[in-house]
């Protein structure tokens, strides 16, 4: 796995790449154009594979939930944008994606995967890296799965909600936090309010 330039608490590496957009058109997009929004940027190994369509469709199906959080989801792999389009145009029952609600970018030179530290150099593909980038372009969360295991969209939504809550309120979110749950005031004395309720 490449070391990359993606570091928590620092600006996420910018990229410019050709994407297949939800309307089926090709468009050059860059990370910087999403400043002011949260971004969930995820890599997957290859088009026309097995775990990948389950993840991509799961993110696409819930694009509106992310939109309500002022969050854009973007997928990426090393395949060409033509390959992405062919996969989108393949019916789901034949292992295709069907219509998409999120852009899929093409990284054929592997530079974006390299920058984000997810390149599996011996195979020239990317691991299942996922990056949560805040509305100021700062990288807030990184997870990288090995190839055989997909990711949970529920958990990604929860993390976006938690980071947005801490941004707004300055309190911190305990393990398993969900909207409406108790949070912790990051202060030795004030935190006791939370801990005193624990069994």
Swiss-Prot record:
Annotated signal sequence range: none
Gene3D superfamilies: Glutaredoxin
Residue numbers bearing the Phosphothreonine modification: 90
Entry keyword Acetylation: yes
Residues bearing PTM N6-acetyllysine: 7, 16, 27, 35, 136, 197
The enzyme's E.C. designation: 1.11.1.24
Covalent cross-link site, Glycyl lysine isopeptide (Lys-Gly) (interchain with G-Cter in SUMO1): 185
Positions where N-acetylserine occurs in the chain: 2
Domain Thioredoxin: 6-165
Cross-link entry Glycyl lysine isopeptide (Lys-Gly) (interchain with G-Cter in SUMO2), positions: 7, 120
Catalytically driven reaction(s): a hydroperoxide + [thioredoxin]-dithiol = an alcohol + [thioredoxin]-disulfide + H2O
Localization annotation: Cytoplasm
Record-level Gene Ontology MF annotations: identical protein binding; peroxidase activity; thioredoxin peroxidase activity
Summary of the tissues where the protein is detected: Found in various tissues; high concentration in liver.
Family as reported in the entry's similarity comment: Belongs to the peroxiredoxin family. AhpC/Prx1 subfamily.
Additional note from the record: The active site is a conserved redox-active cysteine residue, the peroxidatic cysteine (C(P)), which makes the nucleophilic attack on the peroxide substrate. The peroxide oxidizes the C(P)-SH to cysteine sulfenic acid (C(P)-SOH), which then reacts with another cysteine residue, the resolving cysteine (C(R)), to form a disulfide bridge. The disulfide is subsequently reduced by an appropriate electron donor to complete the catalytic cycle. In this typical 2-Cys peroxiredoxin, C(R) is provided by the other dimeric subunit to form an intersubunit disulfide.
Subunit structure: Homodimer; disulfide-linked, upon oxidation. 5 homodimers assemble to form a ring-like decamer. Interacts with GDPD5; forms a mixed-disulfide with GDPD5. Interacts with SESN1 and SESN2. Interacts with FAM107A.
Designated name of the protein: Peroxiredoxin-1
Source species: Mus musculus (Mouse)
